[in-house]
Regions:
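Conserved active-site-proximal phosphate/metal-binding subdomains
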Residues: 1-115
Length: 115
């Protein structure tokens, strides 16, 4: 939404996403997160694959990768090295609208369906 305070690069990354743009990272930590694929997501997935095969995975590695990652993308606009959290629905978001426009569109479709 236009009222959303995330960095413009974050919004642009969501708008460019397609239906295959997201992956789940963090499963090894017990805190899975769906994110848009980028350098950080790829590094996280590679670390999970490597550490997941070990009897005693180096969990500090995930702390190092994740610390400050959301701030990088949300506040600083680094959508390559930051965590760009997004659901699978990102591929269906194709324009930025105000909250009121989004709600009006939802209600119009609802009213159309209940006739």
């Amino acid at each position: 939404a236009t009222e959303c305070t995330v960095h413009e690069n974050y919004k642009a990354k969501i708008l460019k996403a397609n239906d295959l743009a997201t992956v789940i990272t963090g499963q090894i930590t017990g805190h899975p997160v769906r994110v848009i694929k980028n350098k950080l997501a790829n590094a996280f997935l590679a670390a999970e694959k490597e550490e997941g095969s070990k009897e005693n995975p180096d969990m500090a590695r995930f702390d190092q990768l994740g610390t400050g990652a959301l701030q990088k993308s949300v506040k600083l606009g680094d959508v390559d090295n930051g965590s760009v959290m997004s659901g699978q629905i990102a591929g269906m978001v194709n324009k930025e609208e105000s909250c009121s426009e989004i709600i009006e569109e939802i209600m119009a479709k609802f009213n159309e369906l209940v006739k």
